[in-house]
C-alpha cells in the first residue's frame, strides 16, 4: 500500500507542477474544459480495493474469457448504438434547419421527424438498458484484466519483480481524457500540452485550435488518448488486445514513477520520448502474453485489421516521408507551404482509408514522441530494441534502464 500511495503522491505532485508551469495562453483557451485529476482520483482510487475485499462480490466476478468477450461485445454494441444516435440526431437537426429555411415540405418533414424520434426513443431505451448491465459488470471485467496483466508481468518472459517489491495493476475502462498539444509553427516541438475532458465537443475543439493559431501563432491539435497513467490507469475501451497493451503501457509509467527514469519524464523532450517508447515496447509485449493466456491461442496478426484500408498503401513509409518533407520546408522558413502540404497529405491518407482529422506541426510533435511511430524522427525505438536484445528478458532490461535519468545514461547501455 505504501508503494501505491507513493505513486499517487507523485502523480498529484506532477499535476500541481504542470499547473504551475502552464502558460496563460493555455489556461485561457482551455478554461471550462480541463480534466481534473484530483477529482478523478478522489472518485476512483478506492473503488477497486473495496470490491476486492467484499466477500459478497465473488459470484459476480468474471472468471473466463467467454464472459470477458461477452462484456466487450456489450461495450461495442453500446458504442455502435451511440454512434447511430448521433447520426439520427444530426439528421433531425438538419430537418429542423430545412423547415426553418423553407427547403422542405413541412408535412414530409414532420413524417420524417416523427420516424426519427421513434427510432431515437427505441435506441435510447436500448442504450440505457445495456449501460445498466455494463456498469454492473465493469469492475469485474477490470479485475479479470488486471489479474491477467499481472500474471504476464510476473511471467518468465518479463519477470520484472522480486519477492518483495510489487506494484498492483489497477485500471479503469472508460472514455479517456483528450489532450491539447501545441507546437511552434516554425518547427516541430512539443512545447506544451494539457488534458481535457473526454466529452469536449468537436466545435469547442475546432475553436480552441483556431484561437491558438490565429491569435497566438501556434500550431495546436486536440488528440484522443488511449490511456492515461493516473492510478488506477484510465484505459479507453476497444478490442481485447488493445486494452491489454494500453493498460500494460500505462502500468509501466506508474512503476517507473518510483525511479529516476520515470521522474525524468518532464525534464526534456528526449526523456519524454524515451519513457513513452519503452512503455510502448513493454506494453506491446506484455499485452500479447496476457492475450494469449486469456484466449488460450497464439495471436492473429490480423486481429486489429478492422478498418477498410488500402493494403497496398504503406502508411508508415508515407508518414515518415511526410515528416521529412515538412521538416525540410520548415527549415527553409516555408511555414505556409508546409501546412498546405500536410493538409494535402491528409487528403491522400483519407482516400486510402486513414481518416485523420488534422495533420500539423503539433500532430507530429505529439505522435513523434513515441519512437516506434512512423511520425517520429528519432532512433530511440531502434536503440531500445538493441538494448533489449542484450538481456535475458524484458524485466532485466527495465531493472537496469529505470535508473537512467538522462539520454547519456541510456546510450551508455548500448556500449
PLM region spans:
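Pan-zinc metallopeptidase signature
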Residues: 310-415
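Phenylalanine-focused residue identity feature
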Residues: 35-40, 45-46, 56, 89, ...
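Solvent-exposed, acidic/flexible segments
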Residues: 74, 78-81, 236-245, 272-276, ...
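N-terminal low-structure segments adjacent to metalloprotease catalytic domains
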Residues: 1-152, 391-415
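Acidic/His-rich structured neighborhood in mature extracellular/periplasmic domains
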Residues: 93, 97-303
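Sequence-level detector for tyrosine residue identity
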Residues: 10, 33, 52, 71, ...
Amino acid at each position: 500500500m505504501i508503494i501505491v500511495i507513493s505513486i499517487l503522491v507523485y502523480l498529484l505532485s506532477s499535476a500541481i507542477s504542470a499547473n504551475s508551469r502552464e502558460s496563460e495562453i493555455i489556461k485561457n483557451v482551455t478554461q471550462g474544459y480541463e480534466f481534473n485529476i484530483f477529482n478523478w482520483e478522489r472518485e476512483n482510487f478506492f473503488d477497486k480495493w473495496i470490491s476486492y475485499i467484499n466477500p459478497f462480490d465473488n459470484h459476480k466476478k468474471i472468471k473466463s474469457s467467454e464472459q470477458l468477450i461477452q462484456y466487450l461485445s456489450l461495450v461495442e454494441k453500446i458504442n455502435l448504438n451511440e454512434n447511430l444516435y448521433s447520426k439520427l440526431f444530426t439528421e433531425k437537426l438538419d430537418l429542423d434547419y430545412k423547415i426553418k429555411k423553407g427547403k422542405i415540405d413541412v408535412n414530409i418533414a414532420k413524417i420524417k421527424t416523427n420516424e426519427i424520434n421513434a427510432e431515437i426513443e427505441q435506441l435510447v431505451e436500448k442504450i440505457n438498458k445495456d449501460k445498466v448491465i455494463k456498469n454492473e459488470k465493469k469492475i469485474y471485467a477490470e479485475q479479470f484484466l488486471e489479474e491477467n496483466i499481472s500474471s504476464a508481468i510476473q511471467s518468465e518472459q518479463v519477470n520484472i519483480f522480486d519477492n518483495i517489491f510489487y506494484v498492483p495493476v489497477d485500471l479503469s475502462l472508460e472514455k479517456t481524457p483528450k489532450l491539447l498539444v501545441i507546437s511552434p509553427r516554425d518547427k516541430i516541438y512539443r512545447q506544451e500540452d494539457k488534458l481535457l475532458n473526454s466529452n469536449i465537443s468537436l466545435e469547442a475543439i475546432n475553436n480552441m485550435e483556431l484561437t491558438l493559431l490565429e491569435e497566438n501563432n501556434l500550431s495546436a491539435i486536440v488528440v484522443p488518448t488511449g490511456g492515461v497513467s493516473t492510478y488506477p490507469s484510465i484505459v479507453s475501451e476497444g478490442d481485447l488486445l488493445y486494452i491489454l497493451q494500453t493498460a500494460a503501457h500505462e502500468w509501466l509509467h506508474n512503476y517507473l514513477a518510483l525511479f529516476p527514469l520515470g521522474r525524468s519524464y518532464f525534464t526534456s523532450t528526449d526523456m519524454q520520448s524515451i519513457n513513452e517508447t519503452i512503455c510502448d515496447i513493454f506494453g506491446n509485449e506484455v499485452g500479447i502474453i496476457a492475450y494469449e493466456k486469456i484466449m488460450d491461442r497464439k495471436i492473429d496478426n490480423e486481429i486489429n485489421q478492422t478498418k477498410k484500408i488500402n493494403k497496398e498503401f504503406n502508411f508508415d513509409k508515407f508518414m515518415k516521408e511526410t515528416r521529412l518533407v515538412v521538416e525540410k520546408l520548415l527549415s527553409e522558413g516555408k511555414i505556409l507551404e508546409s501546412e498546405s502540404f500536410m493538409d494535402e497529405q491528409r487528403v491522400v491518407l483519407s482516400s486510402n482509408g486513414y481518416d485523420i482529422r488534422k495533420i500539423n506541426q503539433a500532430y507530429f510533435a505529439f505522435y513523434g514522441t513515441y519512437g516506434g511511430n512512423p511520425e517520429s524522427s528519432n532512433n530511440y525505438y531502434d536503440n531500445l530494441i538493441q538494448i533489449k536484445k542484450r538481456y535475458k528478458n524484458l524485466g532485466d532490461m527495465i531493472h537496469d534502464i529505470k535508473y537512467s535519468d538522462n539520454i547519456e545514461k541510456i546510450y551508455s547501455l548500448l556500449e
